[in-house]
């Protein structure tokens, strides 16, 4: 698929894709994923062609931007590494997020509270989100999926080839997808200017890591308070010594 020059992959985005290990695929390859295979390393790991990845990101973004009501797009991730990314994507684009377990019947059983009638479904992993893809096929909802080289492509209309198991890779794909959607909608007018949102915001964060960071910040804050108190005490001591010296001079006069 040839893209207009405006949509070409920039060196900066290519570096992001490589740094996030988007190009690292699985050791097995499904027959439908062979067009996205770049080469195989000596250790058996297959490399994904990031140029094909970028083409599919642009195609998916154009499909998403063509839907008038953003809430009719449902972003799904039962995989832990993709839940934060899905929530951020929905916050920035206005889509509906399903982060966590997908409730069976959400697309087919109108009696359930979680019933939805989306016009487009985006999933993080065709294996872990198989229930959502299956129900979407029952009601003719097109599906966009982040797929590895060994991922099944049944009922998937647009496959974005990438490493859909790494937390950085998943977060970056959702980030680039959201950025391209906003550009196509006109929210980000100048393509030469970087988006103010950083890709790190889409990356999964371990709760223990967050608690540890908060504890370190609290400890650092306590140390700063203690240091300020020590400085204030020293200043008070110096002021008292100076005042005492002045009083002695006055007394000697």
Curated annotation (Swiss-Prot):
Entry keyword set: Acetylation, Cytoplasm, Ribonucleoprotein, Ribosomal protein
Region of interest (Disordered), residue spans: 212-253
Modified residues (N-acetylserine): 2
Gene Ontology CC terms: cytosolic small ribosomal subunit
GO MF: structural constituent of ribosome
Gene Ontology biological process terms in this record: cytoplasmic translation; ribosomal small subunit assembly
Location of the protein in the cell: Cytoplasm
Ranges annotated as biased composition (Acidic residues): 219-238
Physiological role: Required for the assembly and/or stability of the 40S ribosomal subunit. Required for the processing of the 20S rRNA-precursor to mature 18S rRNA in a late step of the maturation of 40S ribosomal subunits.
Family to which the UniProt record says this protein belongs: Belongs to the universal ribosomal protein uS2 family.
Subunit structure: Component of the small ribosomal subunit. Mature ribosomes consist of a small (40S) and a large (60S) subunit. The 40S subunit contains about 33 different proteins and 1 molecule of RNA (18S). The 60S subunit contains about 49 different proteins and 3 molecules of RNA (25S, 5.8S and 5S). Interacts with RPS21.
Name of this chain's protein: Small ribosomal subunit protein uS2
Source organism: Eremothecium gossypii (strain ATCC 10895 / CBS 109.51 / FGSC 9923 / NRRL Y-1056) (Yeast)
Gene this protein is translated from: RPS0
């Amino acid at each position: 698929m040839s893209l207009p020059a405006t949509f070409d992959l920039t060196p900066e985005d290519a570096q992001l894709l490589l740094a996030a290990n988007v190009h690292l695929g699985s050791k097995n390859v499904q027959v439908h994923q062979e067009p996205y295979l770049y080469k195989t390393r000596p250790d058996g790991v297959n490399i994904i062609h990031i140029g094909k990845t970028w083409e599919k990101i642009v195609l998916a973004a154009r499909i998403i931007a063509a839907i008038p009501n953003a809430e009719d797009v449902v972003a799904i991730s039962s995989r832990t590494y993709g839940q934060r990314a899905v929530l951020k994507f929905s916050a920035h684009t206005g889509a509906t997020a399903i982060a966590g377990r997908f409730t069976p019947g959400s697309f087919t059983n109108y009696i359930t509270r979680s019933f939805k009638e989306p016009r487009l479904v985006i999933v993080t992993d065709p294996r872990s989100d198989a229930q959502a893809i299956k129900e979407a096929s029952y009601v003719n909802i097109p599906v966009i999926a982040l797929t590895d080289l060994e991922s099944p492509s049944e009922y998937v209309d647009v496959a974005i080839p990438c490493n859909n198991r790494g937390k950085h890779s998943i977060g970056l794909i959702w980030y680039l997808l959201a950025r391209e959607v906003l550009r196509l909608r006109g929210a980000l007018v100048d393509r030469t200017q970087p988006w103010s949102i950083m890709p790190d915001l889409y990356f999964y964060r371990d709760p223990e890591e967050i608690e540890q960071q908060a504890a370190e910040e609290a400890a650092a804050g306590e140390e700063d308070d203690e240091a300020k108190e020590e400085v204030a005490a020293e200043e008070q001591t110096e002021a008292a010594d100076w005042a005492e010296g002045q009083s002695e001079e006055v007394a000697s006069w």
